[in-house]
Amino acid sequence: MTTILDELRWRGLLYESSDGLDDLLERERVTLYIGFDPSADSLHIGHLLPLLTLARFQRWGHTPIALAGGGTGLIGDPSGKTQERPLLSKEQVAANVEAIKRQLAQFLDFNAGDHSAMLLNNAEWLTRLSLMDFLRDVGKHLTVNYMLAKDSVRSRMMSETGISFTEFSYMLLQAYDFAYLFEHYGCKLQAGGSDQWGNITAGIELIRRTSGQKAYGLVYPLVTKADGTKFGKTESGAVWLDPKRTSPYRFYQFWYNVDDADVGKYLRYFTWLSAAEIEELEQITARQPERRTAQQRLAREVTRMVHGEAALARAEEASQALFGGSLASLSADDVADIFEDVPSITLPRQDLEGDGMSLIDALVRCGIATSKSDARRAIEGGGIYINNVQSADVGRRLTLHDSIDGQCIVLRKGRRHYHLIRLV
């Protein structure tokens, strides 16, 4: 491989790029940027591709700029949207920017000498831009005809809801971002998802018209799933990078559960593994799909990258708990997260004080057993587990000593029939 573009090609991450970009990257190290929309107080897994694109360029010796959209976030990007988005308050956008800046920082190297990463906020220049300056310095150079020809605008113009002037102007603001970074930081390249191509080329055109110089664009494909459903969404919503919004366990499980048809592509997109390593994992999947070897490697690589080694270890311990693994090292929060979807009952903590409650009564109250005699037979048959530890004693009583952090107890019948007791 001679340039970063060769790596992006074999990973399937080069959807479209400006003419001459290969030659530019062979000649020199460049500064590039990708913008991040602060529409929430956390990035989600859909942002991993742009984050890793910046990181991959940096590993090839280029200088990445992660641009938080503190200014453009006040407007809202219409690209890929079928209707107008509600405007966020200035205070909410500012708070979101601060939150995502911390996440952006963990993927890039800010102490890499002459190609150290930069973290900028376009509110610094957009909020100082007067309406008169905007119309003279930006609006004058891009015609309405040019803007209407862009897919992001044309598709909205054809819809019932149309597009407001506010969102229509977003393209000009993003173009100004590129021109500003070109002038002040020598940034020659903007990257983004394929739905950003129209906005990126508008910036290239603005730079050409205002400075007579050439800038470049590059877009990667939007992430898709083989079954046609939206990537990055689960039944409970988006998969966030913030562990408070999506626990490392559920983050790990998302990647572990990807389809065989997608796992090879995602290994290329979201990990640093080599082509040879990925091809070997794909061959194992083809021969023995039930082992889920590739999915496990994908889950390990991405969880470690986002949450760290310690969180990965806990996520794997938690994953084993569903298959009878030990709960000894897990917290009550971990257990509640793992067993969120299993049947549960709530009991007063005082019911387990002192001698507590008989295991037989607990099994009946949970519904694991239909009667006391049914519970007795299950215990005597060795099929009952307390916190994944087998209990064959029909005289066993549940007390607070059995609880995890005084908050919950996990009962199990057989291999997979779980029930959670929550204590209040």
Swiss-Prot record:
- GO terms for biological process? tyrosyl-tRNA aminoacylation
Q: Motif location ('HIGH' region)? A: 38-47
Positions binding L-tyrosine in this chain are: Y33, Y170, Q174
Q: Which InterPro entries match?
A: aa-tRNA-synth_I_CS, aa-tRNA-synth_Ic, Rossmann-like_a/b/a_fold, S4_RNA-bd_sf, SYY-like_C, Tyr-tRNA-ligase, Tyr-tRNA-ligase_bac-type, Tyr-tRNA-ligase_bac_1
Q: Which residues form the S4 RNA-binding domain?
A: 357-424
Q: Which GO terms describe its molecular function?
A: ATP binding; RNA binding; tyrosine-tRNA ligase activity
Which reactions fall under this protein's catalytic activity?
A: tRNA(Tyr) + L-tyrosine + ATP = L-tyrosyl-tRNA(Tyr) + AMP + diphosphate + H(+)
Q: What class of enzyme is it?
A: ligase
Q: Which Gene3D superfamilies match?
A: HUPs, RNA-binding S4 domain, Tyrosyl-Transfer RNA Synthetase
Report the function annotation for this chain.
Catalyzes the attachment of tyrosine to tRNA(Tyr) in a two-step reaction: tyrosine is first activated by ATP to form Tyr-AMP and then transferred to the acceptor end of tRNA(Tyr).
Q: Which family does it belong to?
A: Belongs to the class-I aminoacyl-tRNA synthetase family. TyrS type 1 subfamily.
Know the name of this protein? Tyrosine--tRNA ligase
Source organism per entry reads Roseiflexus castenholzii (strain DSM 13941 / HLO8)
Q: What is the lineage of its organism?
A: Bacteria, Bacillati, Chloroflexota, Chloroflexia, Chloroflexales
Point out the gene that encodes the protein.
tyrS
